[in-house]
């Protein structure tokens, strides 16, 4: 599943090619992804893309009409989605290529084998409505201090891994990145959130930020379907200390990495180094 790093990699790849350009055509081949697709071929042409930003795992596309009216797309890549840039004329679409948005001589194509993604046209700012208003802080939000993070952790007895995955305090903590950040901070993934000291909470927040920054620089994680906008794979999994390394030696102590299940997801950790 594309997580925060993969969505940010996508945003950074798309923005220079299409921001400031006008939509000239749209081709939708699939009537329904996670939700039915609106008539984007009638709604988008003539609109100029002013801004492309990320909020958690969503992309917010802000458009302006010739009359100055703002319109938005709120997109989510679901379990297997990705956006790809092509010069016009683009290669013929394949089975899982569901939508093309054309900006003159540049085409962006949405591909999603499992069809759990979404493309929603909106006439109101999506940042002011659900689901975005229920999201936790961005990892680099300046208001998310170590003190605030610690205070939020004190409100729940759930395991720290489950709390991070929920996205209610801070967004972006996908399964791979949770395992890696918890290892970097030396915190056991099953430890209750309210049993983490203030100092260790600060270390965890720092580790999470560094893990996500490293993942973005690596182009994200390609485990199955994700590719960047030019078709490139993300190589972060090659640098993982614990994720996907069950039975292999811990890079710190040399003892075997363990795997457990939490909420139906695999967690990788070192029982010797994480407490």
Regions picked out by a protein language model, each given a short descriptive name:
Residues 1-4, 91, 139, 143, ...:
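Generic detection of long, well-ordered alpha-helical segments
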Residues 1-111, 115-118, 245, 249, ...:
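A cross-family signal for N-terminal binding/gating loops and helix N-caps
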């Amino acid at each position: 599943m594309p997580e925060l790093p993969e969505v940010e990699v996508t945003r950074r790849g798309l923005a220079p090619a299409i921001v400031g350009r006008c939509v000239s055509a749209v081709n939708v081949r699939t009537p329904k992804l996670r939700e039915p697709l609106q008539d984007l071929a009638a709604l988008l042409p003539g609109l100029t893309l002013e801004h492309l930003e990320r909020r958690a795992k969503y992309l917010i596309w802000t458009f302006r009409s010739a009359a100055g009216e703002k319109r938005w797309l709120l997109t989510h890549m679901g379990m297997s989605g990705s956006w790809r840039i092509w010069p016009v004329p683009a290669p013929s679409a394949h089975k899982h290529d569901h939508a093309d948005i054309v900006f003159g001589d540049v085409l962006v194509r949405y591909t999603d084998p499992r069809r759990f993604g979404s493309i929603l046209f909106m006439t109101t700012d999506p940042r002011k409505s659900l689901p975005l208003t229920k999201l936790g802080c961005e990892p680099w939000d300046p208001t998310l201090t170590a003190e605030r993070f610690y205070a939020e952790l004190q409100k729940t007895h759930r395991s720290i891994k489950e709390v991070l995955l929920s996205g209610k305090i801070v967004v972006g903590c996908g399964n791979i990145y949770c395992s890696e950040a918890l290892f970097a901070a030396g915190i056991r993934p099953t430890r209750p959130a309210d049993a983490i000291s203030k100092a260790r909470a600060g270390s965890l927040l720092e580790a999470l930020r560094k893990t996500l920054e490293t993942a973005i620089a690596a182009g994200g994680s390609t485990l199955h379907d994700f590719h960047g906008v030019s078709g490139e794979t993300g190589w972060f999994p090659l640098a993982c200390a614990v994720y996907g390394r069950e039975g292999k030696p811990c890079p710190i102590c040399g003892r075997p990495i363990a795997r457990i299940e939490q909420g139906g997801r695999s967690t990788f950790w070192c029982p010797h180094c994480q407490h």
